[in-house]
Amino acid sequence: ACGGFSYGDTLGAGLGWASSWRFNPLLRDMLGEFFARGNTFTLGVCNGCQMLAHLAPLIPGAEHWPAFKPNASDRYEARLSLVEIVPSPSLFTTGMQGSRLPVVVAHGEGRAVFASPDQAAAAHSVLRFVDHHGQATEAYPYNPNGSTQGINGLTTADGRVTIMMPHPERGFRYAQWSWSLGDVGEPSPWMQLWHNARRAVG
């Protein structure tokens, strides 16, 4: 699930989109059944991340996910930022843990806000913003939105549903990066997300 500014973000980022599922009994039941099936997986990026965060009550293992609020800068932030992929159950990031990679960010409401420190500690983080020393940070501009502990990607306890505010799909080839040591015609490390998804299909 991707997209951008669904319903104009009038009700809050992703809320209108999520509400179109939550308040339609037929669609809500269908979605609940989908997430309950063990042979499905889902990736939510940016507006898809915000939408799925609103649907967390329907997603097994997502009870510790945060809300996504307006950026601390009160501005739309669009540029490359540096993230670290942290150990998690996510099927999408298998084999990528420990990588520090540039990634495109393009959002106005990407600040992950947890209800409590305990909720943040219990959440299964997937990626976080880091500074030029590789340390998780809440400091601007390394962290473009001010997310708690730099967290900007999460997954469920079983790793089948993953959400993230950054856009790895906008940087899966080196040609999409601002600079690279690699051949610009080659896939970047972000391509591993899609290889992992393909393997999950079988």
Predicted regions, residues:
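A structural preference for short, pocket-lining loop segments at secondary-structure junctions
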Residues: 1-2
